Amino acid sequence: MYVDLAQLEQDELCVEHEYAVGELDLEDAEIVLCAPPRVRFRLQRLGMEIRIEGRIETEIEVRCDRCLSAFRLPVRPDFDVFYAPIEVLKPEEEVELTERDLRFGFYQGERIDIDALVREQIRLALPFRLLCREDCRGLCPHCGADLNHEACRCASQEWDARWAALWDLKRRMEGV
């Protein structure tokens, strides 16, 4: 979906859009859309800059970082970004970025790619660690059992002789 900036004759334009199933590709095999994203946003012309603020609502399916089970995650990020024409970029100049500059995007011509913005905001809304639940116990590193659903199938404790000196030290310290 593109927004034609010629439609922005007034200084503001409000848009509501619900993507059709399969219309938006997240370009990431690890993230599957379960519900078509709904986007509501407002565009404002601020001189040469365009401000877009709004909200996205969708649900995605991802894999847990601990147990690798697929689970659904609601995603509802609010966003507030600025766009400027790419022509204002002067690559030969050295510029110190401010916090506001980190929320800047660039457009070419007279339209802005909203699909790219939606993809970016969905990815940014993901938590650093994707967990199916807070107390996920993960997989056994030896036998691979999902500890959320079954007990570990490997021996209770395998002795590794390389740790013998530390075990002796621990016993001596506990005995003191």
Across the structure, where does each feature detected by a protein language model lie?
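Structured interface patches
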Residues: 1-176
